[in-house]
C-alpha cells in the first residue's frame, strides 16, 4: 500500500491564501514551437478557466463584488522562469485580486522538428501546468 503522505511530500500545511476557498481549476498549456514559457503559461491558465462558470459567486463574496474575490495562480514551469511575463498571465483573469506563484515543474519534450519560421531555437516543446484557486 502506498504511503501517500510521503509521496505527496506534505509541504503545504497551514496555507492562509483565503478564508474561504471555492474552486481549484487545473489546466495545461504548451508552446509547440518558439520555446515561449509565457505563451505556454497563458494557455495553461486559459485551459483551467475556460470550462467553468461561477454564476453564484457574487452571492457569497463580501459586499457581493468580484473585486473582493482572490485568485491565486500556481504555475509549474520547466525552465526560463526569468522570461515568464507574470503581468501578461494576470491579464488572462478578468476579475479579482490576482497573485501568481511560480514553481519548478511542467515538462520539456521534443517536437521532432525545428521550424525557424516559427521562431524555434531548438526542437523543445514547453509544457506548463496551472492551478487556479478562487476564494475570498
Regions found by a protein language model. Give the residues of each.
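C-terminal edge-of-domain segments
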Residues: 98-136
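Conserved mixed alpha/beta catalytic, RNA-binding, or beta-rich assembly cores of soluble enzyme
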Residues: 18-61, 76-86, 126-136
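Mid-chain, well-packed structural core segment of small domains
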Residues: 70-114
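Short connector loops at helix/strand junctions that flank enzyme active sites
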Residues: 66-68, 127
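Metallocofactor- and cofactor-centric catalytic cores in central/energy metabolism, strongly enriched
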Residues: 62, 66, 112-115
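Short, Lys/Arg-enriched N-terminal segments with co-localized hydrophobic residues
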Residues: 4-17
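Sterically constrained small-residue positions within well-ordered secondary structures
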Residues: 15, 62-64, 91, 121-123
